[in-house]
A protein has these predicted regions:
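Intrinsically disordered/low-complexity terminal segments and short unstructured peptides
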Residues: 24-25, 605, 635, 703, ...
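N-terminal compositionally biased, intrinsically disordered segments and leader/signal-like regions
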Residues: 3-6, 26, 499, 617, ...
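Generic cytosolic/nucleocytoplasmic N-terminal low-complexity/intrinsically disordered segments
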Residues: 3-6, 12, 25, 422, ...
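C-terminal outer-membrane/trafficking sorting elements
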Residues: 1-4, 17, 664-670, 674-742
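Beta-propeller-forming repeat regions
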Residues: 36-663, 673
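Bacterial Sec-dependent N-terminal signal peptides
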Residues: 1-40, 736
Length: 742
């Protein structure tokens, strides 16, 4: 905000008073509003797993990665641009001294139209890769227009129109099923790009669209396509792994051709004979098949198929898609594979923790030989619990800092667990170490889609572990909590699970929070239609009973862009008021300021993430199904936002304006004196532990952890009137405040 008197004076000199008011109202007010919520993606927090520090732990996870190399920063080195189909999001990694470094700021440089699939190929032979992607009417193409010293830029190849090809007699759209990935390569070896795609309808054959640019102009600067055959290679796919070579599926005895589901194609010269061989995969198959070209570059003939590579075949639950890019910096294209799926497919699910397979090229460029290297390329250097990560924080070891917990959707046996990371750093410089991938043995509950959070549900002054999950047997979602069985830290035992009578949809999200500040935990429910419902706890301190109070809390009713919103509440801008954070299906974060202001209109802040490359604030997808939690990780007056997502990773959004807290803590304790029938409210400005004593030093409670800037309420029905002491332990130092019960 404009608080410097010199700045105010300068503006007054430039504008007469009416114009100044207009300028401030129209132009500066939005900046003032949004500047209160300004964040950067932070990657500074170290994370240790099995004794090793992860290279980029906060990169967000990967599921269905489509891998391409491209020069992102103009240093003439190939970087990585990955489109994740499940997240509908691009991930960018820079090549820094032959090591990959996650750099999310480059993701904003790609066209917003990218969807379903993305292939980067040099269309016009200028040494810069151009972009091909899915279009509702076929294929969209964007030309790389980047100039030296400038950011990556693009222009549409044919603005407003998809890629065309000459059919039987005239130009038509080159149609590609949205689940398919075509092969875009120089099939005939003449120097320009041709396209292979599965026939859009009918038999399972491949169309060959030959580019006549070189033949007509002698230049490879355009896509002058003509469909020369609808049966490239002379074969049909009949079913998973079954092909009819030189005949139809009916002639083979395989019955009617099965063309449902997606297909992926990738061409390369596997045997160094000067023509293009084919890698083929399809949605219902676990393998990638090699079909060697026994013909020529001008007339392909496929006669057999085999799983590929021969030694250690690509084998995923469903729909592996292959890619060829040099990712180990030796100048030779390596083989990579990742499932080309949106998400899980019921119980037949891919292992999304290990879903990017790398086969290093130990041969040559001309005669490649692919040797299996790892099944978690990039994933092994980031937090990636598989899919649908849900973060939560609490001080489980009572050492004064916040430890991290991550709910995962399911293991390969379709049982969900919670990951536990101990904070081995400090309150202002966190560092996390993986302790277990099955905290509290929650796998024994035989549930999946576990979403953890911490709240005192039984009014004993200790945080309990609250779980939303689905039952493996019947698929129903439920709400329950594990009661904390220790006064020092946290101890959760499965025999102390309490089910809560509350109906929740399988994809809906619950936030436990004291909405009406009566000392009881209430519920905000993010529903499947995008509405946010407020359910008041109308029970007593030791008996929970939720009743619906508002079907459109804060006026947030049904919205197709906000389906299944995930929610968090915290004072984000240090103004003493709670704000609402919403993560939505698209992966976007929206903040509503001061939710208890009773304002008839609430302003949504969405352009909250700073891009240091573009020097702008913008809305940014953090992967679909964003799951936010606000927590003070850096010991500042403004908490960070940690976001989980569909790809199983995490992002840390650090508040740019957060100021380091002063050396002396500030703890609000009220009312003081305290009427004996009331509750004592405590709000510390940083993470604190509180314990109560009589004036004679007798202990009257066990220690309780209070997160920064959150109000905790304490009742003392059994204490007599008199003076008592609240002793606080903050960052290893103790302080005390007196209060009176009268």
């Amino acid at each position: 905000m404009i608080s410097n008197p010199v700045k105010r004076y300068c503006l007054a000199k430039l504008f007469p008073v009416p114009r100044l008011f207009f300028f401030l109202t129209i132009f500066l007010l939005p900046w003032v509003l949004f500047a209160q919520f300004t964040y950067q993606i932070d990657q500074s927090i170290p994370v240790e797993v099995n004794g090793n520090l992860l290279a980029f732990p906060w990169a967000g996870g990967l599921n269905s990665a489509q891998l391409n190399t491209v020069d992102l920063n103009g240093d003439n080195k190939p970087d990585l641009a990955i489109y994740d189909r499940g997240a509908a999001k691009i991930f960018t990694f820079l090549n820094q001294n032959n090591k990959w470094q996650y750099r999310p700021e480059y993701e904003a440089l790609f066209p917003a139209e990218v969807g379903q699939w993305m292939l980067l190929r040099d269309l016009n032979c200028d040494g810069k890769k151009d972009l091909f992607t899915s279009d509702p009417f076929g294929i969209s193409v964007f030309i790389n227009t980047t100039k030296p010293g400038e950011n990556l830029s693009w222009r549409p190849y044919n603005p407003g129109f998809p890629l065309l090809t000459k059919g039987f007699s005239s130009n038509i759209n080159l149609k590609v099923n949205e689940s398919d990935i075509p092969a875009i390569d120089d099939i005939d070896g003449d120097g320009d790009l041709d396209i292979l795609n599965l026939k859009f309808v009918g038999t399972g054959t491949i169309e060959y669209h030959k580019n006549l640019s070189m033949e007509r102009t002698g230049r490879c600067d355009s896509m002058q396509l003509e469909r020369v055959t609808q049966n490239f290679g002379g074969f049909e796919e009949c079913s998973c792994g079954k092909f009819a070579f030189g005949k139809t599926c009916a002639q083979l005895g395989g019955g009617r051709t099965e063309h449902t589901g997606g297909k992926t194609l990738l061409t390369f010269d596997n045997d160094n004979d000067g023509d293009r061989d084919l890698l083929y995969s399809e949605e219902s198959c676990a393998f990638v098949y090699l079909l060697e070209n026994k013909g020529t570059k001008d007339l392909a003939v496929m006669l057999s198929s085999s799983v590929f590579p021969t030694s250690t075949p690509i084998a995923m639950s469903i729909f592996p898609a292959p890619y060829l890019e040099d990712v180990d910096f030796d100048g030779k294209a390596d083989l990579l594979a990742s499932p080309n799926v949106y998400a899980r497919a019921n119980l037949n699910n891919n292992n999304f923790q290990n879903s990017v397979w790398l086969y290093s090229n130990t041969g040559t460029t001309q005669s490649p030989k692919f040797s299996f290297s790892k099944n978690n390329f990039l994933q092994g250097e980031m937090i990636d619990v598989g899919d649908y990560s849900v973060p939560a924080f609490a001080d489980y070891d009572a050492d004064g800092d916040l430890d991290m917990f991550i709910g995962r959707y399911a293991r390969q046996d379709f049982i969900g667990t919670v990951y536990q990371y101990e904070n081995i750093g400090s309150p202002s410089a966190p560092a996390f170490k993986l302790i277990t991938n099955d905290y509290a043995n929650l796998s024994q509950l035989r549930s999946f889609n576990i979403k953890p959070q911490f709240a005192d549900m039984d009014a004993d002054g200790r945080v309990d572990l609250v779980l939303t999950s689905k039952n493996l047997k019947n698929g129903r979602a439920s709400l329950s909590f594990l009661s904390n069985r220790t006064n020092q830290g946290m101890l959760f035992l499965l025999e102390f699970v309490t089910s809560i009578a509350f109906n929740v949809g399988g994809t809906e999200n619950i936030l436990i929070n004291d909405i009406n500040l009566d000392g009881l935990p209430d519920i905000l429910l993010g529903t499947s239609d995008g509405a946010i419902e407020y359910w008041k706890n109308s029970g007593a301190a030791d008996s929970i009973n939720f009743t619906l109070q508002n079907k459109s809390y804060l006026g947030l009713g049904a919205s197709t862009s906000r389906q299944n919103p995930a929610l968090a509440i915290a004072d984000l801008n240090a103004d003493g008021n709670d704000d609402l954070i919403i993560g939505d299906q698209r992966g976007l974060i929206t903040i509503y300021k001061n939710i208890r202001s009773n304002s008839p209109t609430l302003i949504a802040s969405t352009d909250i993430l700073y891009n240091p490359l573009l020097k702008t604030y913008a809305t940014k997808s953090l992967g679909s199904k964003a799951q936010p939690v606000a927590i003070n990780l850096f010991n500042t007056d403004k908490p960070a936002i940690i976001v989980g997502n569909s790809t199983g990773g995490l992002y840390v959004l650090k508040n740019e304006e957060g100021k380091e807290l002063p050396p002396d803590p500030v703890v609000l304790i009220y009312p003081n004196p305290l009427p004996s029938a009331d509750e004592l409210s405590i709000k510390p400005d940083r993470n604190a532990q509180v314990q109560f004593f009589s004036i004679l030093g007798q202990k009257v409670s066990e220690p309780t952890f209070i997160p920064a800037n959150q109000i905790f309420k304490f009742a003392f029905p059994k204490l007599s009137r008199g003076i008592y002491i609240a002793r606080f332990t903050i960052n290893g130092k103790s302080s005390a405040q007196k209060f009176i019960i009268n």
